[in-house]
Amino acid sequence: MRLIAGPCQHESLVHSHNIAKTLTDLCNELGVEFYYKASFDKANRTSLSGKRGVGFHDTLLDFRAIKESIPDLKILTDVHEIWHINNIAVDFDDAVDVIQIPAFLCRQTDLIKAACDTNKIVNIKKGQFLAPWDVAGILSKTENAKEVWITERGTSFGYNTLVNDFTGVQYMLDNYPNVDVVFDATHSVQKPGGNGTSSGGNRAYVPTLARAAAAVGVSNFFMETHPEPDGAPSDGPNMVALDDMRSIIQQLLDIEKVIK
C-alpha cells in the first residue's frame, strides 16, 4: 500500500517536519510506502481572503531541509504554472519527487507536458467535471513521463457537493493498467465553497470512503492530515487529525489482506 499524506499547505519548517516524521515512523512500522505532501501555494481559493501559503522559494528550501533530516523521505507538491516546474527541475531537483497537477488544471496540455518532461513522477488529479473514460485524453499527453498517477477526488453533484462513483474507480483500475490509480479520501468529502468564503467538508466520512476504495482494489491513498485540523489555514473541515491516521491506515491494510 502507498500513502500520500500531509497538510493542505506548508506552514513552517518545524510544522511540516513534525508531520512528516510522525507519518514516516508510522508507515515504516506498518509497512506502507509513504510520500509526504504539502502545497507551497493554494492558488485556487474560494475568495480573496483565503490563505495561500508560504510561497514557492521558502517552501522548497524547507522541503530540502526536511529531506536531509528524514532519510529516504519522498515529497509531492502541486504546481500551477510552467515556471514552477522549470524552477523545480533546475534549482530544487533534490527537494521534490512527485509533481502534482491540480484537478482544475488536469486538461492543461502545456502544464502536463512540462511536468512529464522532468524526471519526476507526475500525479494528475482527475477533475471533478471529468468522466473516468475521459482520462484517456489526459494520458495521451503523458508519453514522456517517468511514471504517472491518476487521482480520483470526487465528482461534482449539484451545488457545493461531491460524490464518489466507485464503478468509475473500477473503470480506471481496469482500463489504465500502466497508471497507478490513487484515491483522495479527504478532498472527496469537501464541499467546494460550502462555507461561503471558504470550502467546507466533513472529515467523519473519510474512513468510510477510503474503506470503499480499498474494497474496490485501490492500494494508493491520498489524505490530508494536520495535528489540529480545525485550526488549519485551509481545508480544515476535511482534513484528518494526525492522531487518527494509524486507525485509518490499519483498516485499509486489513481490507487489502481480505481482498487479496
What are these regions (language model features)?
Residues 3-13, 34-56, 225-235:
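Glycine-rich, proline-tolerant flexible connector loops at the mouths of alpha/beta enzymes
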Residues 10-25, 54-61, 200-208:
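Glycine-rich anion/phosphate-binding loops
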Residues 16-20, 85-104, 109-117, 192-227:
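A short alpha/beta connector and helix-capping loop motif
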Residues 22-30, 51-76, 115-121, 169-181, ...:
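Alpha-helix-loop-beta-strand connector modules within alpha/beta enzyme cores
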Residues 32-39, 74-79, 183-185, 219-228:
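Short beta-strand segments at enzyme active-site cores
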Residues 48-57, 75, 100-105, 159-166, ...:
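Active-site-adjacent loop and "lid" segments of alpha/beta metabolic enzymes
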Residues 118-225:
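Catalytic alpha/beta core domains of metabolic enzymes, predominantly
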